[in-house]
């Protein structure tokens, strides 16, 4: 009787573990979590009312939490109407107890850890040329759902308070929830529900009113945030086959007029077939260097096989025409990506700017440098400006330029500058997101198809699947 209430359908592995001994205990004692021989506990109604309000408010399906059945069963108990519905008290109470316990643990655990596992994003794309290897794009390792605490709290006196405390407290989630309260548009509600799920994962989330840089891929936008101001700019991000990974790091230093050491996969796919073509290498200002000796090799003496041997380095000279532009912003990460200037500023005028091999190109590189170096002295910023071939704005800078007009470009007044303290960086993926300047929720297209993945993974909890 009780076993059929639980069933196996729709139960996650964590839920199965939490309820491993539940049936045996109930069958032997006839004393449940929500009732004993004196009747149903007083807070069963409070917990049910909370779930009936908050589950649909989060865009979730009430049936996935057994709420219609729980509501009917609890009403029968209150009215002592067992005979009129043809069900015995010995059948209904265990069913009510089992469903309400499962709803409690499912909601509390889902809100604390998420209703789906985001690691699925790292099994979307295969490495080019090797279908057995997946490309990692989600650079987090969130904690797996743990029902232990919820299974304990459901038996304690403060169980409603614990349920309430399970809700994510991030400002992004709260903003999305307010928007959900205000909109009746079905498509927007589905989009909001997907983005609310992102807020539940046990990963680093941006904090309100903190000095930080946010890059939101669907918005194709960067915001550099201080407590009292926001610098915004367009970005170009990774193309669909070479997605920009989602990560949390901190910008630690910037490099002015960088040489671009071309990654091996780009050499393989875009450079190697030009081996021996001196015009191509001259036009792109590429050079070939022996990694062991440091010698620059003649283009005509290097074959495609040589370029792919791993013994040579192909790099692009610093200055005008360099693909990284005039400045790069470095931060620790597992993908060798960075934020950088570009030699193609016209790309920022495009509506869709998924163009790169994974790095993020920024529209206002000097302004971003000024944000990062907020405490730098005037000459440091002027040195960066001159090294980027930007017009000087100080008398000292103008005098320096007059004295060095004949010097070779690019100027190298400054090559590296530490960012102290490091500035947190979040590369995010939200298709509904509160604009850091206005607070208004803005909706963006699902450029990488990640929303579709979440929607598919959450069918069991969103009402789009009957298998629970």
Language-model features: where?
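Sec-dependent bacterial lipoprotein signal peptides
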Residues: 1-3
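Cationic-aromatic interfacial patches
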Residues: 5-128
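Well-ordered beta-sheet/strand-loop patches within structured domains
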Residues: 6-29, 105, 122-125, 151-468
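Short loop/turn hinge sites at secondary-structure boundaries
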Residues: 59, 85, 89, 110, ...
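Alpha-helix capping and helix-coil boundary motifs
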Residues: 85-92, 132, 146, 184-185, ...
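Extended, domain-scale alpha-helical bundle/helix-rich regions
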Residues: 113, 129-131, 142-144, 155-158
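Eukaryote-specific, cytoplasm-facing alpha-helical/coiled-coil scaffolding segments in long proteins
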Residues: 126-138
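A sensor for short, sequence-defined functional sites
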Residues: 144-146, 173
